[in-house]
Structure formats: C-alpha cells, structure tokens
Amino acid sequence: MEEVDNIIIHTLRQIGCEIPEEIQSLREFTTTVIVQASSKCLHVINEDIDIPSNLPSSMSAKFRVGTMLAAALQDLGYRGEIGYQTFLYSNEKDIRSVFMFLVEHLPKETSLAASEPLGSSVLLNRRVASDLAQRLTLSWTPTFLKKGGVRWKGSKPKTYFREGSASMRRFHACNLKSPQGLTDLTAKISKETKAYYSVIPYVTSQPPCRQDVVPSVLESNSLSVTAVAEWELEWNQSGLSSRLTKEEYLARKRQRLEKKIKDHVLAEMQRVEAGGRAASDLSDIVSSFSDRVSTIESQTQGSRFTRTEKLQFAQDEQKAAAMAGLSESGPPKMDTEEELQKKREQELEALQNKLKDLASSVDEKKSEIKTMNAGLQQTNEQVTATKVQNSEHEESYKVKKRTVDLLPDAENNIAKLQGVVDSSSQRLVNLAQQWETHRTALIDEYRELKVINANKVSETQKKLEEIKSLREKMKEVAEETRGKDDLYKQLVSEYERMSRDVNRSAYTRRILEIVGNIKKQKEEINKILVDTKSVQKEINQLSGKLDRTFTVTDELIFRDAKKDEACRKAYKYLASLHENCKELIQAVEDTGVIMREIRDLEEQIDTESQRNTANNLERITADHKQMKEENATLTKKIKALKSS
C-alpha cells in the first residue's frame, strides 16, 4: 500500500493541497489534512461544491463540515459506509478508499473523464479513435503501391501495418467435421468409427475457399465453448437439484424432447385433417349451389353448354356496346356516377344476402351435425350399457345353471363343497402364518433400508450445499479476477495515453509492480480453484467408494448373520464402525468450520486493530469534554441574558 499512498499524496500535492513533506503515508494524515484534501478534491471535481477546507473550533461546526463532506461524496456515487466520523475519527482503510475514489474522479487534461466506465466497448472505441487519428497523420499512398494493403510506418514505433480494406475478406464460416470423443483414452472406439475418421478430410481442406478456414475454425470453437457453458449452467441449475446422474438426466431430457416433438406432429396432423374437412364442407356447399343453378338452367331451352355459351357471348356483346356507347333504342346513353353507384350497391346487397343465406344454411347443417353426433354418442353409450347388462345376465345364468345341475345329488355335492371350503380356510391360515414369519423380517429390513436411505439423502443434501457454496465462491473469485483484469486494462490504457514529456518512471514502475502482484494473486487464485476442484472430486470419489463398500459388506455379512453368531457380531461391529466413522468425519468437518471461523475472527481482530480505536476513543472523549465546556459557557450566557 505504500505505492498507492505515494501516488495519492503526489496527486493531492499537484492539485494544491498543503501536505507537509514529512508525511509519507495516509496513516500520518491528521484530521485537518484529511478535511482540507477532501474539500480541495471535491472543489476540483465540481466547482459548485464549496465546503470549508479549515475546521472551525466549535464542535457543532466540525460535525456540520464532516456531514457536508460525506453528503458530497455520496452524491458523487461513493458506495462505501461514510459519515462525519470518517473524517473526524478516521482510520487508514476508510481514508484510503475515500481518497482513491476522489483521485479516480479528478479531471485529467490528457484523457477523458476518469469516471467513465472502461469496459470492452469503451476500450474498442478508444482504440479505433487512436487508429483513425494515426491514419489521418499519414500521407495518402496509391493502392497499387501497397501489396496486400501493407505499408511502412516511419514514425515511432517503426513497423509495418495494414491499411485499407482491399485485402480483407468477409467472415464466412462452414460446418466442420472432426473426430469426437478421442480425449478419453480408456474408451473403446469401434472399427466403423475409426474407418469413418480415417477418411475425413483435414479441417483445412473442408471449406470450399481457403479464406474460410480461419472463420470456420473460430465458429466451431465458439460453438463448442458455448455448448459447454450452457451445459454447465443447465447442470448447475437443474441437474444437481434433480439428484440424477448426467446420463440419466440426458436420457430424461431426450425423452421429454421426443414427447414434445410427437405432440407437435400429432397437433399438426389434426390441424391438417381439420383443414381438409373444412375444405370438403366448402366444396359441398359450392357443389350444392351449382346444382341449384343447373336446375334453373335446365328449365330453359338448350343444353347447359349452349346456354353458358350464349350467356358469355351476350355479356361480351353488352360490354362492347357499353364501351362504344351504343344501344338498340338509338343514340348512345351514358350512365351517371350516381346510377353506377346505385347499381354497385344493389349488386353488393344481393351478394351479401346470398352470403347470409349460405352462412345460415351452413349453421343449420352444423347444428344438425352436432345433434346427430350427440345422438350417435348417446346410442353408443346405450349399446355399451346393454352389452354390460347382457354379460352380467350371462354370468348369473351360468351360475344358476351350475346350481341346478348340482341339485339331483345335493348331499354329496354339499359335502364336497364343505370339504373344499375347509381346505381353503386351512390354506388361508397356513398362508397367514407364513406371511407373519416373513413379515417381521421384511419390516426390519424395510426400516433399516429407510434409515440408510435417509442418511444417504441427508449426506447428498450436504454435499449439494457444499458444491453450491463452492460454486458461488468460484463465481465470486472469477468476478474479482475479472474486475482486476479490467483494472489492469484501465491502467495500461491510461499509461499508453499519458504524455511522455513528464518523467513518471517511478510511478510507472509502481503500477507495473501492482499489476505483477495482481497477476500473482490471479495465479494463486486459479491454483486454489484447481486444488479445490481436485479435492472435491477426490472427496466425491472416496465417499462413493465408501458407500459402495459398506453396502456390499453389509449385504455379505447380513446374509450369514442369521446362521452364524460370529457373523452377527461382525455385523454389529461393522454398524458401530460405520457410525464412528461418520462421527469422525463430522468432527473433522466441524474442526474445519471452527478453524475457518478462527481465521475470520483473527482477520476481524487485525482490521479492528488497524482502526486506531484507542486513539479515536481518546479524541472522542476530548471532543465530548469540549462540547460540555461549550454547553456550559452557552448556559452561562443564556442565564446572564435572562438576568439582565
């Protein structure tokens, strides 16, 4: 933190803060220096903010100044805990975060506003702007002098670069085929698959154009990465909670998809059949209408063909006469717009009446069809009910017929039936006794299996909760790493945009050291994540192996426990050993939790020790005494004014 403190102190001195030369870190800042520097930074950021830079002697005025500073920082977007105590009774950590926030928001002459978020889009826009500015400073060169758009850049840094878009190609990707599932060396590959993989052309030969190789590879890689990310997200959200293996989860998902496809196909087939029925109904209506027209035509002389031919020729002659403006009566007669409009309205009304008649007839037919369907359904129900009654009557008839057949030799038949009933009752008693003997053993086994299942469910739930917590920690670490990467990019971009006329090698070296520390922390975090994953995987494997071993051993010993006393004792020892192992594992987990809590408490103790609580308490006590004295003087003045 010394480098950060030096950068903050140097920046505060540059904007005009009076900081003594002997102060080398934020730990040495007094309340007066903190208030002065904060007020100066706020005024530089926003000139409308005017807060006193010197603390007054009155305690109420001091509290007012501290509250104004805290409110101004909150208006700027500071999200940490802040109040008047941050400035009057400060600690190193809070003051460092406050000054880092203020320094980031200070305006810079050589860059954009520091409060601008530097995301990937902003960095891209800045890079495009710098590249365009660089291109505008260069002289124009004809295209035929630049082979592939490459030209020499004489200024620093001296290098070749590509100019223009003549040599660029469109991003066109093709579907690539490559061997799958070869990463697992233990898996067996069939001969057919090997033969297929042997004849697959190389990836560089699959696209039709050579320029499409790189886009195709990039597209294939992005698709595979996206598929893996989507599968991990789906497995974390739905797969773990389902308590199924990956193969079972995929099989169930495949069944759901097949069912959806089947339902969709059936719905489409029903829709097409319904459309066909509607089309057939419409064709029936049209045919009936044409039959009516044919009956009307049949009443006139001539065949239908000659009649339609005459009508066509008559219509053509009438149209020609209307176009020529001639009529049989004599001079041409032109229809007015009103007459034409009336004719159109009459024709439209006639067509609407015909349409209404057709619609009413269609509705009547539909209602008749509905009534017929209802009657048909009712008839079918009556038929089924009649069939059921007939079957019942047939059964009763068979029973009565057998009874009548037995009546001639009633005494012998009754004795035989009594013997059958007695044997059946005796067999039922024997079966009940056998069931009781097996029932107790089955109930005991059921209870044991129920207890084992409950233990497994609780252990599985614990493992799932641990996995979820680990995944949340991994996400937090990944977000923290991403934030540090963004900070690294921001620092690098700011360093590249800084003017080179000022000698800032020391601060650049410190920034690079900070970046190196960030990289080391990132590597350590990645190493910890890898170790955590491996340990979790090993724990899962060992727990699964332990459960399977215990289950097999339990079955083998329990099979012989009823016959052998030694096996019974061994079974008891096995159960006690299993319970003791569970208690031991629980004790180890509790010990780990306690150790983690101890580390957290130690960290809290360290943070509390850095807050200078004792010094702040002394200062608060002194301020409290000063407030009492001020209150006493004020009460004396009030009494003197009242007495006068």
UniProtKB/Swiss-Prot annotation:
Record's keyword terms, sorted: Coiled coil
Alphabetized GO MF terms: cullin family protein binding
Disulfide partners: none
Coiled coil: 333-383, 409-486, 592-644
Pfam families linked: CCDC22_CC, CCDC22_N
Family: Belongs to the CCDC22 family.
Protein name: Coiled-coil domain-containing protein 22 homolog
